[in-house]
Design a protein with these regions (language model features):
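A contiguous, surface-exposed recognition patch within enzymatic or periplasmic domains that forms
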Residues: 10-162
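Beta-strand elements of well-folded, non-transmembrane domains
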Residues: 7-11, 147, 170-174
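Generic beta-strand structural signal
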Residues: 1-5, 31
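Short Pro-Gly-centered flexible turn/kink motifs
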Residues: 2-3, 156-174
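Charged, amphipathic alpha-helical linkers/stalks
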Residues: 173-181
Length: 181
């Protein structure tokens, strides 16, 4: 699927912008979050907390379990709900892959424009998402990409009458064991 965006400021004042798109997908213990191999760090909203990626060696957001070598690329390992952004994204994709189903989703776009890549999860220990947000679908994760911003709420700006454009692609992937570069 191709998403082409046009952000236009038709006002007489400079204005902030924040664009993020979201793909939600079912997750279980076989699901892996894939950031490019050269991603060294993850960060939380506002770049307030950082962790090594994919193996964390520090408490993240005050959660001690993350400092014991937790592999944060696996959904099953997150002890709490969490949001992790790929810090300083240098490639044109992020992905998620269910190794049990041999299928996943890849989000792609020019990383100089689509600067942000992240995931949000309620985590495997939460029942809130399964009771409130779905009828019987089980746990899910949100893979997200941002244009002109690498974090939330890290705004970008549009000058008066300025136009910014971007193109992002969402791919279904199958039988490739994930993704890397």
């Amino acid at each position: 699927m191709e998403i082409s965006g046009r952000l236009i400021n038709s006002t007489p004042d400079d204005n902030s912008i924040l664009y993020w798109s979201n793909v939600s997908t079912h997750v279980d213990e076989n699901y892996q979050i894939i950031f490019p191999q050269n991603t060294e760090f993850g960060t939380f909203h506002c770049k307030e907390y950082f962790c090594h990626w994919p193996i964390t060696t520090e408490a993240f957001r005050g959660v001690e379990e993350y400092k014991h070598g937790l592999d944060a690329s696996w959904w099953k390992n997150h002890p709490v709900s969490n949001s992790i952004f790929a810090h300083n994204l240098k490639e044109d994709f992020i992905a998620g892959y269910d190794h049990g189903k041999n299928a996943g989703t890849m989000l792609a776009g020019n990383h100089h424009i689509s600067k942000g890549g992240k995931f949000w999860t309620w985590g495997p220990n939460s029942e809130w998402d399964t009771k409130i947000l779905t009828e019987n679908a089980g746990h899910y994760i949100e893979l997200m990409t941002g244009a002109y911003s690498d974090n939330q709420p890290d705004y970008s700006w549009l000058k008066t009458n300025e136009l910014k454009t971007f193109t992002q692609y969402y791919y279904g992937i199958r039988d490739i064991g994930g993704g890397k570069k």
